[in-house]
Amino acid sequence: MQGFRNHRKLSLELTQPRLLVIGPNGIGKSNLLEAVELLGSLRSHRCSQDRDLIQWEAPRALLRAGLDDGDQLELELRRQGGRQARRNGKTLDRQLDLIGPLRCIGFSALDLELVRGEPALRRQWLDRVVLQLEPVYADLLGRYNRLLRQRSQLWRRGAQTNPNQRDALLDAFDVQMALVSTRIHRRRQRALRRLEPIARRWQSHLSAGSEELELHYQPGSRLDAEEAEEPWRLAIEEQLRLQRPEEERLGSCRVGPHRDEVSLQLGGTPARRFGSSGQQRSLVLGLKLAELELVTQLFGEAPLLLLDDVLAELDPTRQHLLLEAVGQEHQCLVSATHLSGFEGGWREHSQILKPGDLSPGVEIG
């Protein structure tokens, strides 16, 4: 990679199934894992603006990876002019076509806020799961976010817009947003249904059978979860129309996927409000292990696992469970401040990078 975060230039060849990146905070450990995540999913869980990923005063950042099957993936982030994706040297018409060859699942200390944090964190987590299963979902999310921004801009223009013209534009927005919203809702619901039985099993294992997990999808529109797609679309369109007075007063759309919630319950009670810190950590760990298992089942091969400073946030028992579950099947990139959390077997089959290897501007490999 070149010009990415604090790395002027870094070249690294992975020689073992596991890469342990060891050192204090601030040397670029998380940045390395973030670069892999970007190549695999086109998304970063740490920021939403590409300009924050490009090294200070650099015109661009370049990420390139070679896979075992010979595939060459490349993503260029430009300070002026957006992104460009290439596969095997060929420029892709759509960034989306870069998704698939490098499936990866990330688990970071930030994910531990999944249970007790705001609903947006759970939506983002569920969206990452859906993207693993259906890469075209990225296009739906992009379309919806553009429509939502354009709708907000229309309201901000306020008095500058003729009321009749504004209502006609809102009618058009309602039709488009209802269609895209329905497709997002259905995919989120489908992914959660696939994930739930696996997550329930992991939660039972992690709690020695004492806790029963329930995952509930609560759409940001008043919908019957069992309805077919067309009734959903019509219901959302009607709700968008009815909420316009409140939308005008508050300045934000009150209906749609951006208001969805995923309810996580243990023993029938909300884990966010009543779960202990240990229960919440076990729940997040179980969800991540379920995600890993589901992707492996569906595609017949294990995804790359990115563990970013998460071991320090888990007690020794949960650390052991996570590392044991990963086993020998998954290629792992792990960042940590110390080697002490890794047993001898893990170290023996790992490539280890220490602070000097990741100093800003150093080229290795």
Curated annotation (Swiss-Prot):
The RecF protein is involved in DNA metabolism; it is required for DNA replication and normal SOS inducibility. RecF binds preferentially to single-stranded, linear DNA. It also seems to bind ATP. It is found in: Cytoplasm. The keyword Lipid metabolism does not apply. Belongs to the RecF family. InterPro entries: DNA-binding_RecF (IPR001238), DNA-binding_RecF_CS (IPR018078), P-loop_NTPase (IPR027417), RecF/RecN/SMC_N (IPR003395), RecF_2 (IPR042174). GO terms for molecular function: ATP binding; single-stranded DNA binding. It comes from the Bacteria. One of its GO terms (biological process) is SOS response. One of its GO terms (cellular component) is cytoplasm. ATP binds at residues 23-30. This is DNA replication and repair protein RecF. The keyword DNA damage applies. Keywords: ATP-binding, Cytoplasm, DNA damage, DNA repair, DNA replication, DNA-binding, Nucleotide-binding, SOS response.
